[in-house]
Amino acid sequence: LPELPEVEARRRCLAANALGRKIDRVSVPDKRILDKATPAALSRGLKGASFTDVERRAKYLLVRTDRNSILLIHFGLTGALFFRERGERKPRFSKAEFYFEGGSCLHYTDPRLFGKIALYETTDDDDIPEIAKLGPEPLSRAFTFKRFNDVIRGHKTTLHQVLMVQELIAGIGNEYSDEIAYQAGVRPDRMTTSLSDGEVRRLYDKMKWVLKQAVNLNAELDGWADRLIIPNRGKDGECPRTHDKLSKKTIAGRTSYFCPTCQK
């Protein structure tokens, strides 16, 4: 499930390969991926245009064009981007394809079709409903400890849940919520009202650390299985520290993993 670090990695892929290239044509093999648009409308809006910039906001990419429009991409559960040069093999599950002059192509792939692509005729992020409602970015300097503390103290729910409310903190999902709780030594099913001041401070610091490390690693975390819980989530997963079997619990309909020894 792409969360903030995974979407940032996709942003880098698009920025490195697709910016400044003139779009020759757009193909949409599966129109179910489109939101508020038809394949013909998407093609009309982008044919002959160029992508000028790409930003990440929470779990979304905002791809700006030289026609004063924004291509919005949400990756759902299994969405990804693949860039290929002319003659290279087309990836499986390609749902939207942006062909550039010269024959190269940016593919949006999505086996399970939970992602969405939309084109907005605006340059203002706040004109996009999905973006306007989002909370602050957890890695921004503006998201201070005071703001984080206000979020935690202002909502009576579990730690796991409050970290994933996109209107409060943008970009954290199921896996990174677990990782933040693990690194802070706090059970994800703890009520926010039970957290001490020290635990809240530790959660804030570990949130920043976890997300920064994941972004720096391009969200490829398997090499850190001796430090992180994410590579160890799943059946028979063990705590990297104690090697105890991880506990699994459903919290508000979401599956969470934690170490019953390390996390209190």
Locate predicted features:
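Structured catalytic/nucleic-acid-binding cores of DNA maintenance enzymes
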Residues: 1-264
